[in-house]
Structure formats: C-alpha cells, structure tokens
Swiss-Prot record:
GO terms for cellular component: plasma membrane. It comes from Salmonella paratyphi B (strain ATCC BAA-1250 / SPB7). It is found in: Cell inner membrane. This is UPF0761 membrane protein YihY. The chain crosses the membrane at residues 44-64, 104-124, 140-160, 183-203, 210-230, 244-264. NCBIfam families: PRK01637.1, yihY_not_rbn. Belongs to the UPF0761 family. It holds the Pfam family Virul_fac_BrkB. InterPro entries: UPF0761_bac (IPR023679), Virul_fac_BrkB (IPR017039).
C-alpha cells in the first residue's frame, strides 16, 4: 500500500522535478543574475530621466495636475521598499532640477529614458533566444507609446477612482473599493508583467504561459517588498554603516532584486512552453517506436 502511494506520488512529482531542472538550466545558461545586474545599472542611470519625462507629460495636461500627486504617492508607497519616502524626496529634488534644463538637455533625458526600454527589450529577447528584430522606427514607436500612454492611463484610472469615492451614492461601496485598492498593487504588477512578457519578445508567447509567469513574478514582487522592508527594519546595518547615505545601497539592492524577479518570471514563461514541446516530442518519439 505504502509502496503504491510512493509510486503514484513519484509519477505526479516527476514532471515538476523535470521542469524545475529545465528552469534551473535555463537560468544558468542565460546568466540571469548578470542580466539583472546590467538592467539594474541602466535603470539607476535612467530612473530620474524616466520619472522626469513622465511628470512632464502630466504637466502638459492640466486635468492630471492633481492626479500626478496621487500617482507619485501610490508608486512610492506600493512599488518601493520601506524607505520609499526618503527615496521619493531625493528623486523629486532631482526631477525639480531637471525641469530647469534646456531643450537639448530635455532631449537627452528622453533618449536616456528610451535606452532603459531598449535594454529591457534586449534582455527579454536574450531569454527568449529570439533572433528576429523589429524595424528601428517600429521599436521607437512602441517605446514611446509605453512611455506616454502608460502614465496617462494610470493617471486616468486614479482619477476615476477618486471621482467614484467622492460620490455620495458610492458611500456604501467605499468598503468594497478599499478592499479592491488593497489588492490593486498585486493586480497592477500582474498586468504589467503579463504585458511585458507578451508584447516585448519578438516571438509568439502563449498567453497562458505569460499569465502564469507574470503571476509568479507579481507574487514574488509583493512578497519581496514586505521581506525587504522587514529586513531593513530588523537588521538596520545599512543605516549604521552608511548613515544618511544608506538610501543609496538600499535603492541599488532593491532595483537589482526587482530585476531578478522580472527575469525569473520571464524564464518561467519560457520554460513552460519549452517543457511542453519537449514532452510532446518525447511522447511522439515513444509512439513511433514499434
């Protein structure tokens, strides 16, 4: 009886073990941690230019002036670790200084922000091992669309939420809306990762695989935020060593950890499809044998 149970358990866990082995092999071959380090470096160089461009877009639309403040607080509260308030103050100072730049400097900011998107495109297509390339004009159009429409859609969403909360007839729904807002960061992360894994690769990505990889990445991202905040609170060694400058290594580590999660989600998405193909090929080979 016990032997039968072990045999059945082994049959069920064997595919999982094989998939995990394939996942680990892909992570090692793609040098995922090195890719994450490269993206973290580019991200830190592009962070202020990217935020400056986004806030400049909001400034161009007076209707989003109030929403831009809400969006800033939402991003730093939900997509940064516990030191998000300190990081927010520094970044807002940098952005305020960038507003004094000339037209040539502003173009440089835009180019730097677009370089981050190019680096993301290159890293994900390395993981998917796609040899296809998009036309440069098409790639620029996609990057610019993400850079402009993304923040505007997020701002419109927050504006609609604020409007609904201000309505008297919606007062009974405030509890429901509050509960939805609690899981909103997870949902936004899931949707963002899904779009990233579906649109950026130059090869076809099965929607089911992208959803699974994005969900795992979103869970790890939200768990990582809480774990990172707990580590900073329980083991404040950075503050003891670096003092006022502690925010710098904290931001470095957080950005690197975030890119590790993003690329891990991409590896999961890739290996789900690859494992399915390998399994089908093995079954076909076994069926063809006399």
């Amino acid at each position: 009886m016990l032997k039968t149970v072990h045999q059945k358990a082994g049959r069920h866990t064997r595919p999982v073990r094989a998939w995990l082995k394939l996942l680990w092999q892909r992570i090692d071959e793609d040098n995922m941690t090195t890719l994450a380090g490269n993206l973290a470096y580019v991200s830190l160089l592009s962070l202020v230019p990217l935020i400056a461009v986004v806030f400049a877009l909001f400034a161009a639309f007076p209707m989003f002036s109030d929403v831009s403040i809400q969006l800033r607080h939402f991003i730093f509260a939900n997509f940064m670790p516990a030191t998000g308030d300190v990081i927010q103050r520094y970044i807002e100072q940098f952005v305020a200084n960038s507003n004094k730049m000339t037209a040539v400097g502003a173009c440089g900011l835009i180019v730097t922000a677009l370089l981050l998107m190019y680096a993301i495109d290159s890293a994900l297509n390395t993981i998917w091992r796609s040899k296809r390339t998009r036309p440069k004009v098409y790639s620029f159009a996609v990057y610019w669309m993400i850079l402009t429409l993304g923040p505007l859609l997020a701002g419109a969403s927050l504006a609609i939420s604020s409007y609904l909360l201000s309505l008297r007839w919606a007062s009974d729904l405030n509890t429901v809306i509050d509960n939805v807002l609690r899981i909103l960061p997870l949902l936004l992360s899931w949707i963002s990762f899904w779009l990233l894994y579906s649109i950026v690769p130059t090869t076809r990505v099965p929607n089911r695989d992208a959803l699974v990889g994005a969900f795992v990445a979103a869970l790890l991202f939200e768990s990582g935020k809480k774990g990172f905040a707990l580590y900073i609170t329980m083991f404040p060694s950075y503050q003891l060593i670096y003092g006022v400058l502690a925010v710098i290594p904290i931001l470095f580590v957080w950005v690197y950890w975030t890119w590790c999660i993003v690329l891990l989600g991409a590896e999961i998405t890739v290996t789900l499809g690859e494992y399915r193909k390998l399994k089908q090929a093995a079954e076909q080979e076994e069926a063809d044998q006399p």
